[in-house]
Swiss-Prot record:
Miscellaneous note of the record: In plastids the F-type ATPase is also known as CF(1)CF(0).
Phylogenetic placement of the source organism: Eukaryota, Rhodophyta, Bangiophyceae, Bangiales, Bangiaceae
Principal localisation: plastid
Protein name per its UniProtKB record: ATP synthase subunit b, chloroplastic
Keyword check for Transferase: no
UniProt xrefs under PANTHER family: ATP SYNTHASE SUBUNIT B, CHLOROPLASTIC
Keywords: ATP synthesis, ATP-binding, CF(0), Chloroplast, Hydrogen ion transport, Ion transport, Membrane, Nucleotide-binding, Plastid, Thylakoid, Transmembrane, Transmembrane helix, Transport
Gene Ontology molecular function, alphabetical: ATP binding; proton-transporting ATP synthase activity, rotational mechanism
Positions of transmembrane segments: 28-48
Organism: Porphyra purpurea (Red seaweed)
One Pfam family in the UniProt entry: ATP-synt_B
């Protein structure tokens, strides 16, 4: 407020001086301010146009370059995203195929194991029957041998009891004669 009071005498002196001379301060506020503002504005535009213009042009070019670079990055990111989505879809297809193949393989293995188990059971049954038949034959043979042995023993005992030395000599001579004819 104090500076406004000090300026007032200066304005009065300038206005008195302007009435005496052709160049001076115009006390009409509307007329003087519009011209002064226009002069100041044109002066600023003229002075700052070149430096601000080149700075603004550089800034505009940088902004446009940044926008273009961002758009390129967005386009690259979009293409990478679409490529990744394609790869994901292909991977899902491959995973599904692998799962199907694994299920088929598991089913084949299970069927093969069951079939092999059935074959093994049949083979064991046949082997068991064969072993039983072999054991029966062996037991029959042993029984037959035992019967033959007992029969021979009984016949031998009977012959020893019933056979005299004359009969034994006749049998020996008869067998020797048969052997002599064959030679």
């Amino acid at each position: 407020m104090n500076s406004i009071v000090n300026i007032t005498p200066i304005i009065i002196i300038l206005s008195e001086h302007s009435s005496e001379h052709t160049f001076g301060f115009n006390s009409d506020i509307f007329e003087a301010n519009v011209i002064n503002i226009l002069l100041l504005l044109f002066g600023l535009i003229y002075v700052l146009k070149q430096s601000l213009g080149s700075t603004l042009n550089e800034r505009q070019l940088k902004v446009l370059a940044a926008i273009q670079e961002s758009e390129e990055r967005l386009e690259q990111a979009s293409s990478r995203l679409s490529e990744s989505e394609k790869q994901l879809a292909q991977t899902q297809i491959i995973i599904n195929q692998i799962k199907k193949e694994a299920q088929l393989t598991a089913e084949k293995v299970r069927s093969s194991i069951l079939a092999q188990g059935q074959i093994d059971i049949e083979r064991l049954a046949i082997t068991g029957k064969s072993n039983i038949e072999t054991a029966e034959k062996q037991i029959r043979r042993q029984i037959q041998q035992q019967i033959a042995f007992l029969a021979l023993k009984k016949v031998t005992l009977q012959l020893e009891n019933q056979m005299s030395s004359d009969i034994q000599l006749r049998i020996i001579d008869n067998n020797i004669a048969k052997l002599g004819d064959q030679l």
